[in-house]
């Protein structure tokens, strides 16, 4: 997959260079330079004063990488440092860091913003295959316009002319290239830039029809019926919702009717975002997502201004949420996202996270934003998730430069609720091709949130064993089972429960064998027990937030599965509760 992706990118880069990287195209992008904005949207998003202070010293941190740029800003070496990752490069050229300078405030921060924008114009005013990628252009146009009042409303006429001229050129480029084979969050960001340029720059309102058409086409495909984003990544969901709120804002400030599909998408995505939060206000960790800043999440929810009802279940997004007392469990009950949307996807089907109040207990390991970094591949693997692995094999193939291949063809899920508990029964056939085994996971959370019971079964795959929900899925399951190799014996398996770094754990001898005592940061104690396997405490890491990996522990239940299959029952009991 990565080879074909690289070949496509090589071919596309060559075509783009011929079409856009010439003086004639520079002339095509020319046009009348406007003297002022027709509309100025507000930018409600927070920045970091600490990051702003670092930027005064030309130190930039994006995507887990910090670089100090020692060359003058009006040189190419400043804007294209040799050791920058792709994600870092995108962060620099998107100019979202202008918010950090605004948060710092003062004349020095404003002067630095103008110096850096002018330096960029010296080096990248004409098309460049990297810095003019549609998503980067879209972010840059929106950030320059949205932060107009901070860095160039009071600037001299020469500076203002250069910025307005570049904004016009970048907007015309977006109008010519979109959708440019883009999809997912990158396309939404590019559309946002086109909307800002089209609605805020006088005489560019011709973009409006294109913006409406692109929104209709994109939102109809990428925002699912329950409000989830098709990439199944909570961080991407947050970013897309934020972009859509910005697009709605620029329609409003320009006094143009907001597209109905845009309003509907925001109203559906808002409760889905709440669905993906833990009690600490941050996000669950699935498919490359991070915790994210809870203050930013609150701002997004407030700006969404949606009165949609909260979700109990997300059947299209394919996540399930169990809530009892102050306890919360979120289960990934679906396959990775489809091709074209799975670059950030993980092989974490049927993994779950478990929190109580504001404290996370069981988590997934997190992610790394740079596809070429070895951490990205390692964290995308099944073993970095709180679920089952067989013989250290991924449930979906993990591609080294991002993405997955050969995902489970069948993932089923049933939800049952009573007055006493919520039960989820889910299964996937990702291990059928290699081992002829179906993984079935059952979770029960009691109404008080004192006990989480689970059972993980590895069952020989036979036609109908996946409990498919329809005739078409039954046919798929039967085909998968009939082509599967016979189960072999013995095969080692491991059920992993990665613990949050704030959780302390130790193995103790119990009446029925070894158990694990967990203690949260607040001192609340939980006891983990298991039947059908051997309990071990092992090292793990946590990358749910920015910064270096944080050491932590994982509970691992080991066992072997043979021709007859295997089953392990396990439970987390709050210590004051009766098991």
Predicted regions and their residues:
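Helix-turn-helix repeat elements of alpha-solenoid scaffolds
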Residues: 68-74, 109-114
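Short, solvent-exposed loop/turn segments at the edges of secondary structure
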Residues: 189, 347-349, 383-385
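CBM-like, beta-strand-rich accessory domains located in the C-terminal region of large
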Residues: 86, 138, 184, 367-579
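Carbohydrate-active enzyme catalytic cores, enriched for enzymes
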Residues: 224, 228-365, 417, 552, ...
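Aromatic-lined, polymer-binding surfaces characteristic
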Residues: 85-266
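Residues that flank catalytic or metal-binding motifs in active/ligand-binding sites
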Residues: 93, 318, 350, 384, ...
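Short strand-coil-strand connectors
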Residues: 63, 323-327, 357, 391, ...
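Extreme N-terminal leader/anchor segments
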Residues: 1-72
